[in-house]
Amino acid sequence: MGKKHVIVKPNARQASVSITPAGQLLVTVRAPASDGQANQELIALLAAYFGVPKSRIQLVKGHTSRHKVIELLD
C-alpha cells in the first residue's frame, strides 16, 4: 500500500487519527513516549484506522522521533 508520513503526539487525553492540511497523518496517543509504548499504541490505532492487522504495519523510520514513516505491507 505504500509509505505514510506520521506525526505522533504522546500523552494525549484522547487517542485519535486525523489528516493535516499537508496530507500527513496526525496521531494522538494516550501512551507515554517511553519504552516503545507510544509506538505500540500508534501501530494499533493505525491498524484499526486502515482496517488491516497490526502485522501489516511496519515502522520504517523515526523510532524515537515524533515524525515517523510507516509502511503498509501488502
Swiss-Prot record:
Cellular-component GO terms for this entry: cytoplasm
Please report the name of this protein according to its UniProt entry: UPF0235 protein tsr1994
Name the PANTHER family for this protein: UPF0235 PROTEIN C15ORF40 (PTHR13420:SF7)
Q: Which InterPro entries match?
A: DUF167, YggU-like_sf
The species this protein was found in: Thermosynechococcus vestitus (strain NIES-2133 / IAM M-273 / BP-1)
- Give the matching HAMAP family: UPF0235
Stored SUPFAM superfamilies: YggU-like (SSF69786)
- Domain of life from the UniProt record: Bacteria
* Coiled-coil blocks: none
Which family would the database say this protein is a member of?
Answer: Belongs to the UPF0235 family.
